[in-house]
């Protein structure tokens, strides 16, 4: 059963393959009739027909069709958060086995899966039920994904529907030719060992069915949220990080900015890329762009360092005061860390709500071999965008030196992580 408040919008792209208003009639007897030149029978005048001359006319191209699919309770919550945050240029879907949860979903398009199996009562925390429900509704899922160029699948791993159904949704999306990106969370430790074990199984199943998989470790959020944060608020933080992962990629495709990126650029980096890491940083002040970049690549959300990444998509967003020099400073900071031959795609977007601040989202792919543990964030004015400002004790791996204390505020310059300092030899 498909609950779609905008049914006609769902199939619009699949039914409009041509460009309306730009018809082209071809006369088989004269192959030059549609070339823009008039080779008529008038021997007195060999003029170019102005009426038929289409040189210089721009034919509008088709905008990339982006769909965000929230699977299960966690995925649905993330979609709700995206809608509340006015994420634009994408089509939202909520997919669930729980009919009651779907009625409360904010997505305009909703799909209940596994009606015969679950009778709308959910998967009971059992991923096997979630998988069977998705298999039962495979055709309906394909209809929902029809016409998509880029599909984001967001879910909270560890439960029943999200863990079991998300890999099937991804499989269908890939079969239909869409660039498929999974953005999922790994559960908090306090959610229990069973849920953690189920999450790992779901992640493995999803990893082989998507082009790129971004995993957000919820437990890492404990390093950046206050100790007094209620449980419900902690889960809202996790939902918002999922939102930022999707928006960081979709914005650079859908929103015209200082530096425009098209869908083909993003596909070049993310197609068949495997596991990916995501970092987010925000900063203000004189060196805000560089500090935000360092915060992003040193983010507590990173389970390991992005050093050596061979594919990077990053988005720098700022107010109307964002300068090209700041964009360059952020880009150079990231260039210093990744593989010298990395394929790097970045966009710069203006958001007037960020006056005085710069926000950077980094998605890194293409890792080989062992990846070292990520260093902690140390930029003095930088922070993770999803959390209020809070400094936590810095843990420096592979060293016996005592934990560093915060630098005095008067000190000039930037406290740069060790791995960045090692990667900054004199330029040739």
Swiss-Prot record:
Its family remark reads:
Belongs to the FtsZ family.
Give the span(s) annotated as Disordered.
378-428
Is Glycoprotein one of the keywords? no
Q: Where is the composition biased (Polar residues)?
A: 392-402
Q: How does it assemble?
A: Homodimer. Polymerizes to form a dynamic ring structure in a strictly GTP-dependent manner. Interacts directly with several other division proteins.
- Cellular compartments annotated: Cytoplasm
One of the protein's GO biological processes: division septum assembly
A GO molecular-function term, please? GTP binding
- NCBIfam families tied to this protein: ftsZ
A GO CC term attached to the entry? cytoplasm
Keywords assigned = Cell cycle, Cell division, Cytoplasm, GTP-binding, Nucleotide-binding, Septation
Q: Establish whether keyword Ion transport is in the entry.
A: no
**SMART domains xref list:** Tubulin, Tubulin_C
Protein name in the entry = Cell division protein FtsZ
Residues bound to GTP are 73-77, 160-162, 191, 195, 239
Primary subcellular site in the record, as a coarse category = cytoplasm
Query: Its function?
Result: Essential cell division protein that forms a contractile ring structure (Z ring) at the future cell division site. The regulation of the ring assembly controls the timing and the location of cell division. One of the functions of the FtsZ ring is to recruit other cell division proteins to the septum to produce a new cell wall between the dividing cells. Binds GTP and shows GTPase activity.
């Amino acid at each position: 059963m498909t609950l779609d408040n905008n049914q006609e919008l769902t199939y619009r792209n699949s039914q409009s393959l041509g460009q309306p208003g730009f018809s082209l009639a071809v006369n088989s007897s004269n192959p030059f009739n549609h070339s823009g030149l008039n080779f008529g029978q008038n021997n007195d005048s060999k003029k170019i027909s102005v009426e038929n001359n289409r040189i210089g006319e721009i034919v509008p191209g088709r905008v990339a069709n982006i769909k965000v699919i929230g699977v299960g309770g966690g995925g649905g919550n993330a979609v709700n958060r995206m809608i509340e945050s006015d994420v634009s240029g994408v089509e939202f879907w909520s997919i669930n086995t729980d009919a009651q949860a779907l009625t409360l979903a904010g997505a305009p398009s909703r799909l209940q899966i596994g009606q015969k199996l679950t009778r709308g009562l959910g998967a009971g925390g059992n991923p096997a039920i979630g998988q069977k429900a998705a298999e039962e509704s495979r055709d309906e899922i394909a209809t929902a994904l029809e016409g998509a160029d880029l599909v984001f699948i967001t879910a909270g791993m560890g439960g029943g529907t999200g863990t079991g159904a998300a890999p099937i949704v991804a499989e269908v999306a890939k079969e239909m030719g869409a660039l498929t990106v999974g953005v999922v969370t790994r559960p908090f430790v306090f959610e229990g060992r069973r849920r953690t074990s189920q999450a790992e199984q779901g992640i493995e199943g999803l990893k082989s069915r998507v082009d790129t998989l971004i995993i957000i470790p919820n437990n890492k959020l404990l390093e950046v949220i206050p100790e007094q944060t209620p449980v419900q608020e902690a889960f809202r933080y996790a939902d918002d990080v999922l939102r930022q992962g999707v928006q960081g990629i979709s914005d650079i495709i859908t929103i015209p900015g200082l530096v425009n990126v098209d869908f083909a650029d993003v596909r070049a980096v993310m197609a068949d890329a495997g596991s990916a890491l995501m970092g987010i940083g925000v900063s203000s002040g004189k060196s805000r762009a560089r500090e935000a970049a360092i915060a992003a690549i040193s983010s507590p959300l990173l389970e390991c360092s992005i050093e050596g990444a061979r594919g990077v998509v990053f988005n720098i967003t700022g107010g109307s005061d964002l300068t090209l020099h700041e964009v360059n400073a952020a880009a150079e900071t990231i260039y210093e860390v990744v593989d010298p031959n990395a394929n790097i795609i970045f966009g710069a977007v203006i958001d007037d709500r960020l006056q005085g601040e710069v926000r950077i989202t980094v998605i890194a792919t293409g890792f080989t071999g062992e990846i070292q543990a990520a260093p902690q964030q140390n930029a003095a004015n930088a922070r993770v965008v999803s959390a209020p400002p809070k400094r936590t004790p810095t843990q420096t791996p592979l060293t016996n030196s005592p934990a560093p204390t915060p630098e005095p505020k008067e000190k000039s310059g930037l406290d740069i992580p060790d791995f960045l300092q090692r990667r900054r030899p004199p330029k040739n």
